[in-house]
Amino acid sequence: MSPARNTGIPASAADAARRHAELVKEIEEHAYRYYVLDAPTISDAEYDALMRELEEIENAYPELRTPDSPTQKVQGAPAAHFAPVEHLERMLSLDNVFTEGELRAWIARVEKEVGTDAAYLCEPKVDGLAVDLVYEDGVLVRGATRGDGRVGEDVTANIKAIRNVPHRLHRDGNLPALLEVRGEVYFPVADFAELNAGLVAAGKAPFANPRNAAAGSLRQKDPRVTASRPLRLVVHGIGAHQGLAAARQSEAYVALAAWGLPVSERAKVATTTKEILDYIAYYAEHRHDLEHEIDGVVVKVDQFALQRRLGATAKAPRWAVAYKYPPEEVTTKLLDIQVNVGRTGRVTPFAVMEPVRVAGSTVTNATLHNADEIKRKGVLIGDTVVVRKAGDVIPEVVGPVVALRDGSEREFVFPSHCPACGTPLVRENGGVDIRCPNARSCPAQLRERLFHIASRGALDIESLGYEAANALLESKLLADEGDLFLLTPEKLRTVPFFTKKDGELSANAVKLLENLESAKTRPLWRVLVALSIRHVGPTAARALAREFGSIDAIRNASVDELAAVEGVGRVIAESIRDWFAVDWHQEIVAKWSAAGVRMAEEQRSAAKPLAGITVVVTGTLSRWSRDSAIEAIQDAGGRAAGSVSKKTDFVVVGENPGSKYDKARQLGIPILDEEGFATLLTKGPDAARSMAQRP
C-alpha cells in the first residue's frame, strides 16, 4: 500500500524525533529499492511526499538535521556486482519545487545572491537513470551510475553498448583534454510495451515503467543484453573538465553537440519568469509527444560564473531546481475488475480501485485494455498496483507491485455473456478483442453510440447527455440511433424527464430539439464520424467527404476506390463496405436523410484559395485549436501535414513551437504567425507570402 503521510508537524520535540526516525528508516529503505534494486514499491510522488515531510520536520526542529539525513545526501549506493568508481566531481541531485510560488521563491533567492542579470536554461527533466561519462583526449574511458554522488558503479562496458553514445568524440574545434559529462539513460516509450511482452513470454517479471526498464537494462552483467535493448542517452550537465571554453551552459551544449554527444534539442534559454513558466506549461501539455518520459522541467542558471557564485549544498546545487509536474504514477489497491461494453460492442475490462490522486485528479477506475493485457501484466484482484494517468488520457493500470502480495489475491475470470444484454460474447481480431455481437439491440452499445453522436468530434449535440440518453432509452423512444432525428415535442411529452409538472416540455427538452435541428446542418465529415463506422475518425472522414462529396457516392464506391483516397487505406475501406452491407445501418442513413440531416457537401462555386497548398501548424494558437486550424486549412482546399518537408508551402507558428519551426527555418519555408495564417485562409498564398518570416 501507499505510505501514509502525516499532514502536520509534530507539536512536541519527542513526537518529532519519533516521526523523524520513522521517516529516515522508511526513506532509506525505499531509496535502496529504487536506486540499487530497481524495484520500487511506491511511486516517485509518494517518495517525494515522504522527503518533503522529513524536510518540514527538520525545518521546525533543526537539531534533528544531521549530515547523514536523507535530506542532506544523495540517495543510492553501488550495487555489489559492479566495481565502485569515484566521480571526478560530485554528482549531485536536484532540489524540487512543485508550485509556481515555490519556483518564484527560488528565482528570488537566486537574484538576491547574483542580481537580475541571470539567464535560465530550461529543459525537460528526463525520467531515466543518471550516469557519468569521462572522456580523455576525446576517448570514452569510463561510464558510471550516480550512486551516492561521490561513488557510483562502473558500467563502462554497458554504457558503450548504448547506440547513441560516442566512443570517440568528433574533433570539431579544440577537444578538452579531460571532459566529464552527466546525463540520463532512458528507455523510449514506444519500445517499452514490446520489451515487457518479451519478458512475460520468457517467464520473467515485466518492468513497472520505462525508468525501471532503463535502469534494469543498464545494470545487466552481460553487456550484450544491454546492447539488445534500445537505450538512449541525453547529456544535461558537465563535471570536471580541462579546456572547455564555454561561458554558459547553453554554449557548452552547442560544443557538446558538435563533438557528437546527444544533448536535448528542446533546451531553451529564458530571461524572464514568464518565459520560464510558459516553457513549463508547454511541456506539461506536450510531455507525451516526446519519445521519453519526463516528470518535470529543470531550470538552471545559464552562466557558469553565476553558478560558481551560488555554489551547492551537500545534496544539490543552489543554481538549479527541478519543477515537478503532478504525479502521473501512483500505487493503490485494486478492489475489483469489471467490464464495460463500448459503442462497437468491444468488451473492455477496467479496474475498480481505492481512490487515489494522480496527475491532478482523483481516480477510482482505470483501463486494463483487454483480457490478454491482464494476463500479460500479471494483475490479480487484491493487488497493490501502479496506476498511470497521462494528461487527459484515461488512467491505466501499469502493473502489480508483486513484492506486496500476501496470498489473498485472486485471478479475474472474463465473463462469457454480455453483462448488458446477456448475449454470448465472441472473440475477434485473433482472439484479442471480445465483443457483444448484438450491435443493434444491446442497450449498452446504443447508449455509447448516442454519446458518440453527441460528442464535439461528431455532431456536437450539447443537450444529449447521460441523463437525457438514459431517459430516451428507458422510454423505448429509440429502437436505434436512426430514431434520434425523428423525435418530436409530442414524443418527448411522454417522457417524465422531458416534461414539467404541468405537462409542458421542460427547458432541456426544448434545448434538445433545438440542438437536433442544428445538428442536421453539420458538414458531411461529421455525419460520417457520427455513424460509428469502425476505424473512421475525423481524418478519414474529412478525406472521404472531400473526395466523394456525398453519402451515396461513398456507399456506391468500390473498396479499391475508397482505399485510394489519401488517409483512408484498405482497412478503413473494407470497414466502410462492411458497415453499409448491414441492413439496419442503411435504415439509419435513410431515417436521418428523411429527417433532413445533410448527406452531401455544400456546393461552393468559389475556388478554394489553398488548393494544392500544404500547411504545417506548430505551437499553440490563441484563435484556433489544433483541430479547428486543421479543419480551416482543409475547408480552404489545403492539406494539413504533420511534418515539415521540402514539399511544405507554409509553416504556421504559435506559442512554444517545436522542432518543426527549426526545420522550416533550415529549409527556408515561409513562416506565418496567426495574422499571417488568417490572411492565408482568406486571401490565399500570394497575400500570405508578403507577411511571412523567412530565415
From Swiss-Prot:
Residues binding Zn(2+), per UniProt: 418, 421, 436, 442
Entry's EC annotation: 6.5.1.2
Obligatory cofactor(s): Mg(2+); Mn(2+)
Active site positions: 125 (n6-amp-lysine intermediate)
GO MF annotation terms: DNA binding; DNA ligase (NAD+) activity; metal ion binding
Enzyme class (EC, first level): ligase
Source superkingdom: Bacteria
Pfam families (UniProt xref): BRCT, DNA_ligase_aden, DNA_ligase_OB, DNA_ligase_ZBD, HHH_2, Nlig-Ia
Keywords carried by this UniProt record: DNA damage, DNA repair, DNA replication, Ligase, Magnesium, Manganese, Metal-binding, NAD, Zinc
Database matches in CDD domains: BRCT_DNA_ligase_like (cd17748), LIGANc (cd00114)
PROSITE patterns: BRCT, DNA_LIGASE_N1, DNA_LIGASE_N2
Domain BRCT, chain residue ranges per copy: 605-694
Protein's job: DNA ligase that catalyzes the formation of phosphodiester linkages between 5'-phosphoryl and 3'-hydroxyl groups in double-stranded DNA using NAD as a coenzyme and as the energy source for the reaction. It is essential for DNA replication and repair of damaged DNA.
NCBIfam families tied to this protein: dnlj, PRK07956.1
Family to which the UniProt record says this protein belongs: Belongs to the NAD-dependent DNA ligase family. LigA subfamily.
The protein's name: DNA ligase
Species this chain originates from: Acidothermus cellulolyticus (strain ATCC 43068 / DSM 8971 / 11B)
